[in-house]
Amino acid sequence: MRHYEIVFMVHPDQSEQVSAMIERYRGLIEGDGGKIHRLEDWGRRQLAYPINKIHKAHYVLMNVECGEAALAELVSAFRFNDAVIRHMVMLMERAFTEASPLAKGREEDDSDSSARRARDDSDDDGDDDEDDRRASAD
């Protein structure tokens, strides 16, 4: 079996269908004895250029190990699904399991915002932090 990296983009009006689509594609791959090494739902993102007058799409990244038959069936499912506006399949030399740079950036953004929220919640004196800034400057 070979390793593949698959990215597909779903029409933004069909975003609520993405989890069902992922499960269907997972069944195709695992039903043929394949494995999914990495699955990332990147969510809605701005497109670099409009596709059929659409400016946003829901992105999904999958790193899989599967046979030729399962891959052909998966690509066929992409082609005949009107909700999938683009897809790309790349042959990889090995399986990638670590988070992609985009997913790492999102995790850092989430941790930064939660730390910022915790810091804001800990400041309970009700002022605008002007006296806190003056005290730290002294």
UniProtKB/Swiss-Prot annotation:
Organism of this sequence: Thioalkalivibrio sulfidiphilus (strain HL-EbGR7)
A cellular component annotation (GO) from this entry: cytosolic small ribosomal subunit
Protein name: Small ribosomal subunit protein bS6
Lineage: Bacteria, Pseudomonadati, Pseudomonadota, Gammaproteobacteria, Chromatiales
Function of the molecule: Binds together with bS18 to 16S ribosomal RNA.
Biased amino acid composition, Acidic residues: 121-131
Similarity comment text for this entry: Belongs to the bacterial ribosomal protein bS6 family.
GO BP, sorted A to Z: translation
Entries under Pfam families matching the protein: Ribosomal_S6 (PF01250)
